[in-house]
Amino acid sequence: MTPAELSAALRDALTAAVAAGELTLDPADVPAEVRVERPKNRDHGDWATSVALQLAKKAGLPPREVAALVQRRLLEVEGVRAVDIAGPGFLNVTLDAAAAGELARSVVEAGPAFGRSATPTGERINLEFVSANPTGPIHLGGTRWAAVGDSLARVLEAAGATVTREYYFNDHGAQIDRFARSLLARANDEPAPEDGYGGDYVTDIAAAVLAEAPGLLDLPREEQQEVFRREGVELMFAEIRQSLAEFGVEFDVYFHEDSLHTSGAVGRAVQKLRDLGRIYEADGATWLRTSDFGDDKDRVVIKSDGHPAYISGDLAYYLDKRERGFDRCVLMLGADHHGYVPRMMAMCAAFGDTPGVNLEILIGQMVNLLKDGVPVRMSKRAGTVVTMEDLVEAVGVDAARYSLVRSSVDSSIDIDLDLLTRRSNDNPVFYVQYAHARTANVAVNAAAAGVRREDAFDPSLLTEETESLLLAALAEFPAVVARAGELREPHRVARYLEELAGRFHKFYDACRVTPRAGEEVTDVHRTRLWLNDATRQVLANGLGLLGVSSPDRM
């Protein structure tokens, strides 16, 4: 019995109690999905639910009486061995061995779909992440967002949402001018501007621009700078896109900031806010009443010289997303943008939307790279920062992605290069991938020994403690995925996989899938092969959500 099947049985029990007049509830008050969770203490059963506590007030009954009505009906369900009422009205459900073991076949038959919602939510989410300026390679912070953002997109899709991955291409503003001046100086063998960009990549980009335009340095200096601005940004952005693709991250939309200003989108956004009464004029400038919506002060949107302020682009971009039909706009920002959150939320509210619903902002903390216990602060190519390429070159894509996504974005993380290249159980990505490789090896050995799944499946035989614990872990996967999407926390999937891998390794040590020399193949072996293959499937599904490969050999 799967958690979804138990949830449905609980709902049926509640519905039957309402129909019999034993439970005074509007049928609409019976939850469409009754939440079941693993008890912290396994002595309290396989699954627990607090649904009786949730419905008691509406039903006008003590929670334990509501629980008793459910208990009586649930005990009639095939596969339910015991239902106990605990504390104020919790229901603890114990399944019989066959019902619990049936999950192994359910997982294998579902295949890649196991853990994914079968019902689309209808929700359209715009997930914007990385959005690094095209003035240099992606640094470690952007690399973390690439790993977390892409994994979150995969998790949200698995939970039933439609997700658009979007990269905001910052090709408008002062940083682009500084980049152009840096390229110009490098091409002319001049010192870099005081506020410019350094690193070997600037030399590479400048040389590439000159190769495409051999007579460029013969032009007037202003024309040179404009060419370096245009061509340098394109070359840098092409390099960024290539790095992301090699990292396994593909965006659906690359949105150019400059288009907001050239298309009139900024003016339209300001006018919409004016029509809503959110705009006023003062000191020769145009202001947005953000202080009415929680910001510490009002913000200038059009400066006194007539030029748009920085926030004007944010206004136009947010409105553009909403007009494209997105219900939720999820934005990932680095810790240095923390102070920017109140004005963004105020902007959302000024348009008549709901902050935290139509606009969500996730703030990520710092990433530190360690080698031999010492922080790595310099890149071979970028000069002052460590880049995505540096990390991938050191440990590979799988280890880089996994290590960046396995911790909550709320916390700073230290990436130990020595640990991530170690083939040992204290290396988390190796530990999980090795579990998958072990399941693959078990399947190969089973085939060689004549153990075939299709010959038998008797879940009542899965009674060993390590088998029960492994089945319990497998059953949790759909809820882990759903919760990770709901909370925007893909690290939950990684931590779950580590727990699952641990339980599989214990099962592997305790339970033989193939008979010893001279022994006959039994239904125990065949049924354990189902459990092995179910574990293999869930490990692959979970690693896939993180953008990490599931190797058959290590």
Curated annotation (Swiss-Prot):
GO terms for molecular function: arginine-tRNA ligase activity; ATP binding. It catalyses: tRNA(Arg) + L-arginine + ATP = L-arginyl-tRNA(Arg) + AMP + diphosphate. SMART domains: Arg_tRNA_synt_N, DALR_1. A motif ('HIGH' region) lies at residues 132-142. GO terms for biological process: arginyl-tRNA aminoacylation. Keywords: Aminoacyl-tRNA synthetase, ATP-binding, Cytoplasm, Ligase, Nucleotide-binding, Protein biosynthesis. It is found in: Cytoplasm. Transmembrane segments: none annotated. One of its GO terms (cellular component) is cytoplasm. InterPro entries: aa-tRNA-synth_I_CS (IPR001412), Arg-tRNA-ligase (IPR001278), Arg-tRNA-synth_N (IPR005148), Arg-tRNA-synth_N_sf (IPR036695), ArgRS_core (IPR035684), DALR_anticod-bd (IPR008909), Rossmann-like_a/b/a_fold (IPR014729), tRNAsynth_Ia_anticodon-bd (IPR009080). It is an enzyme of class 6 (ligase). The keyword Magnesium does not apply. PROSITE patterns: AA_TRNA_LIGASE_I. Its EC number is 6.1.1.19. Its main location: cytoplasm. HAMAP family: Arg_tRNA_synth. Monomer. Belongs to the class-I aminoacyl-tRNA synthetase family. This is Arginine--tRNA ligase. The lineage of its organism: Bacteria, Bacillati, Actinomycetota, Actinomycetes, Kineosporiales.
